Every structure is written in C-alpha cells, then in structure tokens.
Amino acid sequence: MFLMNILCLVIPILLAMAFLTLVERKILGYMQLRKGPNIVGPYGLLQPIADAIKLFIKEPLRPLTSSKLMFTLAPTLAFTLALSLWIPMPMPHSLINLNLGVLFILALSSLAVYSILWSGWASNSKYALIGALRAVAQTISYEVTLAIILLSVMMMNGSFTLSTLTTTQEHMWLILPLWPLAMMWFISTLAETNRAPFDLTEGESELVSGFNVEYAAGPFALFFMAEYTNIIMMNALTATLFLGAFHNPLFPELFTVNFITKTLILTAIFLWVRASYPRFRYDQLMHLLWKSFLPLTLALCMLHVSIPALSAGVPPHM
C-alpha cells in the first residue's frame, strides 16, 4: 500500500516535469515570435516523450579521465533528492506528515550541492568544474536567505509543520503581511534553482553548458529532470507558504485544484522571467544577496521574532 502511495506521488510529478519542458519551449517560442515544438504529435504534445526515448536509448558516454563512480552517482543523487523533497508537501495530505517538514526540505536542498560538486569534479573538465563551483557558491549563498525567510514564516505559523500553514492562512494569505519577504523569497528561489536571470552556471558564452557539460544521454536527462522537478517543487512550496489554499475536509479535491492552479501560475512567472531578463553578472548576483537581501531578511526576522514576545501572545493556532 505504501508503495502505491509513493507511485501516486512520483508519477504525477514526473508527468508535470515532462510537460513543463514542453510548456517552457512553447512559451519561449511564442515570446520570440516563433512556434516552438509542433511536429511530434498534435501541437507537439508528444515532444517530451520523444525527448525521453531519444536520451535514454543513447549510449551514455563519459570522459576517459573521469571518476566513474562519482560521475554516475551525481545525477542519480540529484534526481533522488529532487523527488524526496516532495515527501512533506501538503497536497492536502503529505506522503509522510513530518513534524519538522520545513527543516527536512532545507536539509535535502542543501544536500543537492554535493551532486553538483561531484559532477563538476568527476568530469575532469575545467568548464564543468568552474560551472560547479559557481553553482555551489550561488546555491549555498541563497539558501541563507531562504532559511531566514522560512524562519520568519514559521514564527507566524507557530510550528515547523507545513500542513498547519493551511490553518494559519484560513482568513488571510501570508503574502499580505509578509510581502517584502515573499518578494525576496521568490527571487531567491529563482537563484536557488539556477534559473534566468541567475543561470550563471550555464553561461553558454563562457562555460558551454556548466557543470553538466560532459554528460550525455541518460545521466544528462537525470540532471535535466532534477532541475525541472526542483522548479515545480519550489513553486509548490511558495504556494504553500504564502498563498495557502483553503482546505475543506469534505472536499479535499478543491484544495488540490487550488494548490495546483497557484503552482502553475508561479511556474509561468518563472518562464516569463526567463524569456524577459538578461543574465546577471556574477558580482551583481553576490552583492544582491550579501548586501541587500541578507540585512533586510535579518531585520525582518528580528521583527517577526519580537512581535509574539512584545504582544505576550502566541501564533494563531497554538
């Protein structure tokens, strides 16, 4: 039965991830005044399936001087972690209702750094290594603000369990009282998932393709799948934290529809940003975090910690 639950979680995520690649190519196509994929199947709907078949039947080549174990392990770890992050997500019921769901998500997203570092180092290529070092520095840096923003939200929520956020947001979405944090959170999720305008890890003009430059076929597909699964996961988390859907226990389907709609809108904004903005310079990327976001989030976190103490009260549902 538990295996069935896992399959019911994993299969829709994989389908969503596959069609997100198609939606992205279509949106970018229309924003650049062209059609996008439209050959395979009606309106190009079977393109993701064709891509998957093509990638997984190709021979997985690797550089002669690369470390075989790490080279294979890195994409597998990246994809496994991307799927594991969904375990505590309330949709409306999570796979395992963890008491410290937020901490679990933070810990696993930090582990994703290892897969990037291993892939860059094991490839034995200077481009891959520089791309990996950039990606690691960027991911670790932006995780600092994500953690502080999460702490502020949890102060409003009163617990580290994600499912209680629906109760907290019954009367008002947290995006309204916490809008500066919500804006910084959204920009940080763009940087965390290595998306434009923060896609410095794959600067084509200087690094060819970043840390996965030596990968081909199946392992490359795993990295690609991990990236898009992470994008959907981050947007689902944003929807849960700041745009909580109303949960009526008699009609749990309404929660799911509401939740998916918000996640889709946020994902569309990700794609819109990618089509609209040029890439940041590396020093600008780091200045934005360490000189703008970090002082602001720390100040706002102190404010949210002091509010319950000053009002001698506790957060809503405790």
From Swiss-Prot:
Membrane topology designation: Multi-pass membrane protein
TM annotation in the entry: 2-22, 37-57, 69-89, 100-120, 136-156, 171-191, 231-251, 253-273, 293-313
EC number per UniProt: 7.1.1.2
One record GO biological process: mitochondrial respiratory chain complex I assembly
GO CC, one annotated term: mitochondrial inner membrane
Main location: mitochondrion
GO molecular function terms listed in the Swiss-Prot or TrEMBL record: NADH dehydrogenase (ubiquinone) activity
Location in or out of the cell: Mitochondrion inner membrane
Swiss-Prot/TrEMBL catalytic activity: a ubiquinone + NADH + 5 H(+)(in) = a ubiquinol + NAD(+) + 4 H(+)(out)
PROSITE patterns the UniProt entry points to: COMPLEX1_ND1_1 (PS00667), COMPLEX1_ND1_2 (PS00668)
Pfam families tied to this protein: NADHdh
Family (UniProt): Belongs to the complex I subunit 1 family.
UniProt function note: Core subunit of the mitochondrial membrane respiratory chain NADH dehydrogenase (Complex I) which catalyzes electron transfer from NADH through the respiratory chain, using ubiquinone as an electron acceptor. Essential for the catalytic activity and assembly of complex I.
Name of this protein: NADH-ubiquinone oxidoreductase chain 1
Organism: Zaedyus pichiy
